[in-house]
Structure formats: C-alpha cells, structure tokens
Amino acid sequence: MKFLFIVQGEGRGHFTQAITLEEMLLRNGHEVVEVLVGKSSTRTLPGFFNRSIHAPVKRFISPNFLPTADNKRANLTKSFAYNLLKLPEYIRSMYYINQRIRETGAEVVINFYELLTGLTYALFRPSVPYICVGHQYLFLHHDFEFPDKNSCQLWMLRFFTRMTALKSSKKLALSFREMEQDDNNQIVTVPPLIRQEVTAIRPEEGNYIHGYMVNSGFADSVEHFHARHPEVPL
C-alpha cells in the first residue's frame, strides 16, 4: 500500500515515530510516497530526520505554540493571538495538504499529531482514510486518568488532541501499558515506536538519571538545584 505521512514539526518525538514506522512499512513491502512536515519560524528540521527518512519531504506552514517568558510552558493567550493572525497561511496549507493527498496517490494517510490534518479532513473531506499516531491519544481513552491539575488546561489539551483527529478512521495511542480497545473513541493502544538503533544499544549501569526536557527553560531549574546541592553530580 501507499502511505503519506503528515508530521507535526515541533519536538523530536513525532520525527522518530515517523522514521520508525517508515522502516516497519518498508520491511513489509509497503511504500511511503511522501512526508509532509509542519513548519514555523521557530522550527528547523533535525539532521537525523533528513538522514534517516527515505521518502521525499515537503513542508507547509503550521500552527505553533509560543513559550512563556521563562520558556517552560506555552503561553496560550499569546499563541492564540499569533495563530489567529496567521490563519490565511494555515488555510493555504490545508489546500496544499489536500492537494498532496490527491496527487501522491496515497491509499492511507498517517497523521503524527498535526492539527491541520484534522482540519483538512473536516473541511475538504478527502476520500483517503487516515490514522492518527501518538501517545497523546491516550488522553482521549475512557480509562485514562489525569492527575489533579488545572481542569481548564486539561480540557484544552483534550480539545486540541480531538482537533488533530477529526474524521480519522482510527487513533493508535502509543503506550507502555496495555489498555483495552476504546471503540467509542476509535482508540487502540499499541507499543511505542522505538527505532532499531535504540533497541540494539547494549545497556550499561551508571550512576545517573537520564532526563528529557520539553522546554529549554527547565535547564535553569536544574542548574539552580545543582547550585544548592553540589553534592549531587550533574
């Protein structure tokens, strides 16, 4: 079968998932005809993605979250105003996505959490089915429980996630924990998409904890902690 990937260009996770899924599809005799990647003024394509992906890559203007002053989280008010001003560009991007779905001859579209994919299917109704992939779709699973946090922010997170999956045929929620299929929300939990290079690495014991920070502002917090606790290796 012929697949078209549409990838949200923010962060590294969606890129590695796309690379891994392409490898799996190619091994099983399928074809990825093209990869569309959302871009903005703050996003650049990482080198490992260009080196690893085999299908042609094309880019389109996509919504972007603007950070707070401390660069630890998204500034929702600022992001909403910014993206509202960019709405004409996003409409052109949706026309472009719809065009690429038709012209590539794709039989299935795979969406890696890109908002404009859901909006394109809601507005243009392409005949090609599409499947959403990402751990974020666990947020919509009927058995998933959020911690006691800001209910408004959690509602907005779920709302955004639903918008990325409008008119989708299925949502593949990446999860280390097995959960039953949620037929009402068309959600199937599957294991995380991990690259072969990672699984081939030989683990070694070390006196450290490896962490991942979504926003660079958290690095200041780590450095401040280390300054107060120099006995903890950094």
Where are these regions (language model features)?
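Active-site-proximal region of nucleotide-activated glycan assembly enzymes
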Residues: 124, 128-189
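Active-site donor-nucleotide binding/catalytic segment of nucleotide-sugar enzymes
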Residues: 174-178, 186-234
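Extreme N-terminal starter segment of soluble prokaryotic enzymes
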Residues: 1-4
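A short, Lys/Arg-enriched amphipathic alpha-helix followed by its capping loop at the start of a domain
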Residues: 21-30, 224-229
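Conserved nucleotide-sugar donor-binding subdomain of glycosyltransferases
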Residues: 71-108, 115-116
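Conserved nucleotide-sugar phosphate-binding/catalytic loop shared by glycosyltransferases and other
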Residues: 9, 27-86
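An aromatic- and histidine-rich active-site surface loop
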Residues: 44, 109-124
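A short, glycine/small-residue-rich beta-strand->loop->alpha-helix junction that serves as a flexible
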Residues: 7-19
